[in-house]
Amino acid sequence: GKAAVHALKVDTLQLDTIFFTVKQDTTLMKLRAGVINGPKNPQFSFSTTLTGEIRDRDAELLVDFKNGKGETGVLLGVNARPLFEGKGKGDGLAFTLIPEEPIIAFQKFHFNEKHNWIYVHKNMRVYANVDMWDDEGMGFRVHSVRGDTVSLQNIDVEIRRISLADLSSVLPYFPEITGLFSAEAHYVQTEKDLQLSVEAAIDELTYERQRIGDVTVGATWLPGEQGKQYLNAYLNHDEVEVMVADGKLLPTRTGKDSLEVNATLE
């Protein structure tokens, strides 16, 4: 089957072509959808295509974005495969990132030693081993701590030196933003509580060609006794602390939690 919409206009937004096709035979179903703005579009010229296949034992989806010059800004997908053998061979869903050399924000990446998978067990425990980097140290890392047999989840996430200029260039109608974005997060969940720590930084942030500067934010969420939860957060600008916030979440007898937050602006 096929479907398409041409010359769609909503206020000032104009999309030249939106299409969707589906083909099916006895072995698989193929899906293809996308948006195309031609070179005569008054706003942005680009093409975005989603290509998918649903097969007997797995399914696959790939995103392909090209700018008006035909340069590939995004080429990234995922293969999903159910595992139900049990006995150490898996009992959940296995996700594999594709292709071997994906492209994000016009940058080509590679996976270190086939570290490109995420596995979700039927009990919702997430196991991950993703190491995706380019030749200049820009990249992503998601690792689960497999040695932790007590926690329900124990995951580390790192994003290193992502160019916001390149990222905003693959997002049509997105404001012009520049800077280098990095972040680290650690998440631990047990049967009774959770712990989360996040720190993110943008070096030389600009918005629509106006300099904002170096920005760093951080937050920590920690469990306490008797169901209490504690929050600590901060905001720095050009290496100067401009805000500190402390809070706590207190359970009550009525079942409605009480949140108290104290913030200090410098």
Stretches with model-predicted labels:
Residues 1-266:
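Interface amphipathic segments
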